[in-house]
Amino acid sequence: MEIIDRFTNLEYGKVRYSITGEASDNLVVLMHGLTTSKDIYNNLTQNLIEQEFQVLSFDFYGRGKSDYVPNVDSENLYVNQAMELIEKFIPTGAKRNINLIGYSAGGSIASMVADRLENCASLILIASTGVPQIPTSPVLISLLQTFESNGEISSELKHEVEKQMVQELEVLEENETKDLALKVYNDLDIWNEKTIDTVKNHLLSTGGYVGDKSMNSIFESIGKKNIPTFIMAGSNDNWVSPESGKEIHKLIEGSLFFEFEDVTHWAFLEKPEVYHRKILTFLKSA
């Protein structure tokens, strides 16, 4: 089935989204990462609709083709965006099983949405942020420090960041997933002023990697509400340490955790068949 992109106006601007698959009691909502767009989920979307799930995917403000919002100072902007969009597809009083999947920075947002929803059937976190941690890559640490000091990104640092991105693309063995990752990054236009501002403010709104703004109470609340939660991490992730996943697992009582050996931050693009199988198995059991 073709993924058809549409646009809708929400409180803070125009948002690109797609809702794919036949109407179903089981809705899966996909939330992308800090520097990606909804397109990162195209292959997973097809797998999900083949299993009779309906899939809602969208670009966060300032990413993909959604409107840029300046001066973001809280992740609540993105949480409210997700809630507003979900409510557009859930008639008042209707009961649907809403399953949330969050990747990277989208994981912490998905967690906050799960805690707010009255009918969250399950939560899947992939290489998720949400607890204090330092990336293993010196290049990324330098970029974060530049953001936190409100400094200018030097041409040397830009070169090193681009070099690392190219190196990480090499782990993607399948041409289809590599082409998809390249498209996402090319569309992002990473050094565009608005893109830099969006990424910087999103990071700083969470307290950055040092975690000045704790989410522990959110994760603990998810556990108390008995929301089935599956957490996945990769042992070679340079962007979000697998220790983050382990810590979130401890905070969400009753959650499941799996660490993929030798897998990077690309996660489901690097090992699509394995990730997709585990995701579908969990969704069907939740």
Predicted regions and their residues:
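Alpha/beta-hydrolase fold catalytic core
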Residues: 1-29, 50-53, 90-91, 121, ...
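Conserved HGGG/HGGXW glycine-rich cap/lid loop of the alpha/beta-hydrolase fold
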Residues: 19-67
